[in-house]
Amino acid sequence: MRRAKIVCTMGPAVESAEKVKELIDAGMNMARLNLSHGGYEEHQSRLDRVREAAKAAGKPIAILVDLQGPKIRLARFANGPHELERGDIFTITTDEVEGTKDRVGTTYKGLPGDCKPGDRILIDDGKVTVEVVEVKGNDVVTKVIQPGAVSNSKGINLPGVAVSVPALSEKDKEDLRWGMKAGADFIALSFVRNAADNKDVHVIMDEVGFRIPVIAKIEKPQALDNLEEIVAAFDGIMVARGDLGVEMPIEEVPLVQKRCIELAREAAKPVIVATQMLDSMITNSSPTRAEATDCANAVLDGADALMLSGETSVGAFAIEAVATMARIIARTEEGGFEMIRALRTTPKKKGGAITRAAAEVGAIVGAKYLVTFTQSGDSARRMARLRSPIPIVAFTPEVGTYNRLALSWGVEPEVTPMVKHTDEMVKQADTLLIESGRAHVGENVVIVAGSPPGIPGSTNAMRVHVVGDAVGGVVAAYR
């Protein structure tokens, strides 16, 4: 059984209902809608196809709406791409202009105020580097240091410069409203710098009338200075290694990845590792050895999920990429499970203490499953962060929780009707474990629940249960 989950970015390469089904069959657990590209009608169609395919497959698939964020970009060129040579003078302006090889506009009107001579500007994830020569009015005049091609809407990074952009652009606000109304399970906020960025998201959510979990994308050096506060304020994090590797020395990224994963696990928040996981599979049917090792190391670091971007959205081998990643994860877990480091912190809350005790008791009694009943998913996430070798099944009456737990490491979610007593919960567990073939009569499971049922965050009970006792009426309370 594979524990770490797979996030797939939707796009033209997997547009049909048949392709979505193949993604799920290959191992997709979450579908990402990247709102940097495409319109609402296009994304709604993709979301609907994922929901339909998930229902047909009988599997939980989470939907992540990824906001573009205040990404600084070049504007559009009259034609192109244009090849910039070393030493060329290239001007980036806030004026509305039709781009040429020598001068182009930008989406960020504050660029001249944030730049000074000597600053380096990286274009298209660092493929092209220019150095600021002078700032004249609305123009930032630069000299090409690292040559390469420039084209429409390529991203701009300013390493070491604290740009004065808001957490949410006007586009992001509209995209957030759309994503919530469309039925997203998670929102991803780009270029998070501090914990306060989440407040802007919650203002919009409160206007809509409800909240859903928000994942902070860690891709700016400023975020690393506030990482613990960000993890505490958000509902999960994504290690977005693309911009992160452009904004800071590349040799720092592996250690940042490990730190992000460790802090998220300690807080029982899901953590996704993203960018260039199997990048060569956009055009090749098999990955490089380095990519396979990268995926394996993310698993051994303890990540909840690994994300595919262009590999599935525009790649020529989208299904193969998912299947390959699933095999790498499964084999890594099979042969290297003990290398996943145990948490170095002790639980600080009742729910954490009970789930940790359940995992320890489960190991002692040889439990077939760790079972949790959950409204919000909190107890399942607390169980998941322990990275126990015993599989976890989470029963919930909430469809939203069922879908969201598809992202959490090792959790197999199931939807069950709401009941009023813990004995009824145990009977539900008995029935579903036996009917699904997960466990057989006479095997032990450890059950974690809240009593009385139905109160989020009320985990306060643990019991060792012998499968079959409830449906067989062995104990008087079950008769």
Residue ranges of model-derived segments:
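Non-catalytic helical/linker scaffolds that mediate oligomerization, partner binding
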Residues: 1-479
